[in-house]
Swiss-Prot record:
Family statement drawn from the similarity comment of this UniProt entry: Belongs to the bacterial ribosomal protein bL12 family.
The keyword Ribosomal protein appears for this protein: yes
Subunit structure: Homodimer. Part of the ribosomal stalk of the 50S ribosomal subunit. Forms a multimeric L10(L12)X complex, where L10 forms an elongated spine to which 2 to 4 L12 dimers bind in a sequential fashion. Binds GTP-bound translation factors.
Any GO molecular function: mRNA binding
Protein's job: Forms part of the ribosomal stalk which helps the ribosome interact with GTP-bound translation factors. Is thus essential for accurate translation.
One family name in Pfam for this protein: Ribosomal_L12_N
Organism encoding this protein: Nitrosomonas europaea (strain ATCC 19718 / CIP 103999 / KCTC 2705 / NBRC 14298)
Superkingdom assignment: Bacteria
Keywords: Ribonucleoprotein, Ribosomal protein
GO cellular component terms, A-Z: cytosolic large ribosomal subunit
Protein name: Large ribosomal subunit protein bL12
Membrane spanning residue stretches: none
Claim: rRNA-binding is one of the keywords in the record: no
Length: 124
């Protein structure tokens, strides 16, 4: 019993204003929505979808070097490819972003390495 969208649109186009009003009321009752709320929901849906899509890339932020700064510098050098001075400056300047635009799995792995080295970090 599949009805094509074109058939539905054609039926609606042939309705009078009174019939359209009754159709809208029946749809509101059947689906438990109001016409005004449906407009807002449609406008908000693309923004929500965009927010979900953006969460495919994560950033790991070093919040504190901790007590064992040497180990933290070693981990930062290993994962970023920075030189000793650059890695030390990054660790000393916490909070700083260590890596950004990485997958959730990579971010979790990097966070684990930094925490094991004694650093404080978070994923955003």
């Amino acid at each position: 019993m599949a009805i094509a969208k074109a058939e539905i649109l054609e039926s609606i186009a042939n309705m009078t204003v009174l019939e359209l009003s009754e159709l809208i009321k029946e749809m509101e009752e059947k689906f438990g929505v109001s016409a005004a709320a449906a407009t807002v929901a449609v406008a908000a849906a693309p923004a929500a979808a965009a927010a979900v899509e953006e969460q495919t890339e994560f950033s790991v932020i070093l919040t504190a070097a901790g007590d064992n700064k040497v180990n933290v510098i070693k981990v930062v050098r290993a994962v970023t490819g920075l030189g000793l001075k650059e890695a030390k400056d990054l660790v000393d300047g916490a909070p700083k972003t260590v890596k950004e635009g990485i997958s959730k799995e990579d971010a979790e792995s990097l966070k684990k390495q930094l925490v094991e080295a004694g650093a404080g970090c978070e994923i955003k």
